[in-house]
Every structure is written in structure tokens, then in C-alpha cells.
Curated annotation (Swiss-Prot):
Native source species: Oceanobacillus iheyensis (strain DSM 14371 / CIP 107618 / JCM 11309 / KCTC 3954 / HTE831)
Coiled coil: none
Protein name: Histidinol dehydrogenase
Cross-referenced HAMAP family: HisD
Keyword Metal-binding: yes
Amino acid sequence: MEILSLHQWKQQQDTKSSTIRNKQVDQDVLRIIEQVQIQGDEALKHYTLQFDQVNLNSFEVTSNEWEQAIKKVDSTLLDALETAAGNIQRYQSEMLESNWSITPETGVKLGQQVNPLDRVGIYIPGGKASYPSTVLMDAIPAKVAGVKEIIITSPPNKNGEIDPVVLAAAKIAGVTKVYKVGGAQAIAALTYGTETIPSVDKIVGPGNIYVTRAKKWVFGDIAIDMIAGPSEICIFADSSAPVPYVAADLLSQAEHDEEASSLCITTDRSFAKLLQEEVNRQIPLLERKEIIEASISQNGKIIICDNNEEAINTINQLAPEHLQLMTIDSEQLCPKIKHAGAIFIGNYSSEPLGDYFAGPSHTLPTNGTAKFSSPLGVYDFVKKTSLIQYSKNKLAEAADTIITLAEAEGLTAHANAIRIRKENDNA
């Protein structure tokens, strides 16, 4: 794990080229989307055979498959999922918004109506790991919001099955249906619908670059949560932080994939050296060490800042997905952080606490988008409608002002819609 001054790190960032706009990936994704639009389920069968090496006659997980899968899940794991689900539901319930109205003056009523989306789709990745936690984190906010139909798509394994733990989590979270479809083809199916899979109002959930680019291309035809990149962790630590804890937390994110980013910011060069040694000591002990080594080699850095102010400015510029504050004054520093997906405060608020258990969703903005984006929550699964009600007298009072504004924009039909009421009432 490389130790760099802030200046050196910034120079490295300037020389990095973005890989998100991969023209070949976009060409492949657009072809897949087009084929799913044209051929529906037949295209899904073709791509599932091509990419997942399994020939499926049907995509929906049946109730019997669901029940049998859940029976395979260890009771201790089921209890853990239930406990985490309870924490998530409790946290997300605090975000619920209600309808409201005001009467600023007699004859005028203004308000807002909050309604859940009708149907949402959640993409759950397969591949290098199973993600039942993502099922809970993405589906429970939708359920709390009042969404009636919650659909999951996830790539099947070589036996044409979905991981039983994912299905157990889906049942606990209140998911309506699960389909064995992955990749860009799943995003296309959720957007445009097929003979089997209905179209949805919004797609949420992480995926590989094909899923991510597909979500970007269908945005506008449906809503999406965000354009997610590789996982990120940034830890601001000083000599008060236990070095083994900091190292373990950095490596916990590095095991996601080779592109994951693990940064530690500190003002203490001696601490940085100890951390570097501890990271090197821990890596060989970990099960996914090959992925971790590749990730740390490419994207693992310890950045030396001159003082706390410089460190805070760097963090806010970076806007990391996960930020851990492991300094002697973590609570005092927290209000100074303006841009981060989630902030973990203190030595015992390890990032995996947020991944699995605490309650806030672990679906967070990446690639600096925490500067303008928020974590996934209940508010992502509702829409708001403005309510406007004027009495005859109040419209008459406002008529001349409205007509003046409409005519100033050259929209005489707008003006006429008001004038006709004014003249009719005065007749």
C-alpha cells in the first residue's frame, strides 16, 4: 500500500483515464437492449445461455422453488437476516413523508400528495459473491414506502438457480417476484417488459459495468437510483486509532473487486508507516487475498496531509462512498464533512456495520457523486404531486397579475384561460 503526499496523490489522479465510457461495452449493451425489445423472452433465453451457461425454459422463481430454497438456509443465518431487516425497517420508517396542505389565505389551498411507485425492479448481482444484504437494503425501503410490486432480477448459477440465501432475504424483505435473469438483458426486460417480466417504474441496485451502462442508457424511459461505480472507502485516522482496525477496514472494501478503492488519510507519517506494514501483514491471512492484493496494488493509498483542515478539504473534494472517522476528535470533525455517502464515527463503527446491520442503506453514491446524491432510501420509492385549489374570488383577485405574466411570455392562450373566467364571472 503506497504512502503519498497529498500533492503526489493528486498528480496520480490527474493521470488516470476514465474507463466508464467504454465504447465497446456501450455497443454491446445497446445491442442487447434492442434484442430484448424486439424478441422479449427469446432474447433473454439466448443471453442467459451465452453469459450464464444455462438453458432456461422459464425465468420466474416458483413458490415451490422459493420454499425449498429457504429450507436450505441455516437457521442462524435466517435469524441474522431477520435482525438486520428489523434494523433497516426501523431506520427507513423515519423517512416516511405524509401529505400536507396549507391555507395561506381564505379561498386558497396548497399542498403536496405523496404516493409510492407502483412497481420497482431491484438488480441483485451474482458472480464473485452472493449479496442477500443488498436485497434487504434495497427492497425494505421500497416496502416501507408502500410499493405494491417489488421485483428482483438476478443471474442464475450453472444449475439455473438463485442462491437460497438471496431468496430467503427476498422473502423477509417482502419481495413480490424473483426472476433468473442477469446483466444488461435484465435491465432491458425491467424497462420495456417481456412476455414474462413486467416493466417497472424504477430500477435500483448495483451491478457490473454492463448493468451500470444499461441503466444509464434506459434512464428516461424509467427512473434509476444512481450510476454506481466500484466500492470506495476513505478512513481519516490519527495515532489514537488502533492500526489493526484501520488496516482491516481498508481491506474489507478491497475484497469487493479489483477496482475497489481503499484510502487512508492521516497527518501522521509514523502512523502511515505502521499502517502500511499492518496491511501487508493482514493480506496473506485473508480468504480473498488475490482480489485484495490486486485492489490494494492499484487503488490502495495512504495520503499524508499537513493538518486536519487540509484533510477535511480533501475528503469533501473526494466525496467518498464510505467515510470512517477514526481520530481522537471524530464527533467534532463530523459536522465539517459535507460530502460523503455514509459517515462511520469512531473506532467501533466499522464500515461492515453499515453494510449489514445498522439500518441505513448500503446503496450509496460513488465516484464523487455524493456531492449531489444521497443514499438509497424511502424517498427514492415515492413521488410527490403538487395540489392547488383557488376559489372563484381568489382567482379573480389574481387574474390581472397572471394575465400580465402570461402575455409577457407571449403565451396568449394561457392568458385567455384566465381572462375567460374573469370576463364570464363579471358578465
